[in-house]
Amino acid sequence: MELKETFQKVKAASKTLGLLTDEQRNEILQAVADAIIAESPALLKANAEDLAKMDKANPLYDRLQLTEQRLQDIASDMRHVSTLPSPLGKVLKDKTLENGLHLQRVAVPFGVIGMIYEARPNVTYDVFSLCFKSGNACVLKGGKDANASNSAGVELIHRVLITFGIDPNVVTLLPATHEATGEMLNAVGYIDLCIPRGGKKLINFVRDTAKVPVIETGAGVVHCYFDKDGDLEMGKRIITNAKCRRVSVCNALDCLLIHESRLSDLPVLCEGLAEKQTKIHADAKAYEVLKGHYPDTLLYKAEESEAKMKEADANVKSIWNTEWLSMQMGIKTVVSEDEALDHIATYGSGHSESIVSNDETAQKKFQAMVDAACVYVNAPTSFTDGAQFGLGAEIGISTQKLGARGPMALEEITTYKWLITGQGQTRA
């Protein structure tokens, strides 16, 4: 496969975006949002083709599925992005040197952003809206599981762009093949930034293979630590929401860490989990407390579960670093906050972590010591989301430290350049 010509067209098209005013970009985004609602039957039909090929028990099924409500949410997010202030031209630094030179550091687009993602057709729309608003062209490489959904979405966007006289190559969908991924990752000079959004396997492959700049997003092994001074009812609400609101997303809870002095409260903390039929893989202490108080068919010994997982997959190192993406989670007993912090440092992915505690000292220590993009006190990790943060749609959750970190929205997909104005000065 040879995609060089495709990348050349995208690069050329990206230059035309600089000619658009923010008002024009906003009008086009609103038109695409309107088209999503108007053409929702066709979009759902394409999505049904993808869903028919996937087992409903697959953790990716929920991510893949589009509904009328989800399409309305996608359109609403796109309209919201159109109302946000443009990041372009924003003066980040302004100074005049002693020699009279005037310096400004201003925000500009990256140029062409490559996005690699799995069975999540909503990402197609989110990436387009954020890239278009920020003056970036985008190259999309979706998973084969969502190929019909992604194709229908990009075709819709193209139709709207053409009616406004915009080169449709500003958003390009690549074939859903492994070869296309490799070509994108090696498209030096054409792709200015690549963002993978998916599981560990995808993230690791991109990081190890790419020759173009990469920002890692996605994989989350998420913890909630219930401290010795945690409020029981608050903890129950937070744990249930963090785990059960939507299990297939990267901010969903994977492991509850509970202070051993609060083990007697574990059955109450897990009531909401039982109602939602959540499978629990508990360590020995937690298992003994839950036995008889939690449905037998949903309660497992973590040690035995880990052995079965390792038998099925030689790459499994520990049950505690599992991103479940399903109605399953672990529970681990700790003797102190320090042990909880050590556990998170060992098994966490730097995504989102939370503590439930009324002890201000414990709260501040947790915030200071946890190395993650988003650190919560008395709130569920389900809030890690660009829209929830008031950023509009997100292009991903960055788990790295260089460049963007946390929810990536408009500002995070711009770079900057220096503008220097003089009056004929020369350097000695």
Question: What spans do the regions from the language model cover?
Answer:
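Residues at or immediately preceding the N-termini of alpha-helices
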Residues: 3, 22, 232, 263, ...
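Rossmann-like NAD(P) dinucleotide-binding subdomain of oxidoreductase/dehydrogenase enzymes
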Residues: 83, 92-233
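Conserved C-terminal structural/oligomerization subdomain of aldehyde/semialdehyde dehydrogenase
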Residues: 311-428
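Flexible, glycine/charged-enriched surface loops at secondary-structure junctions
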Residues: 22-24, 165-171, 247-252, 279-285, ...
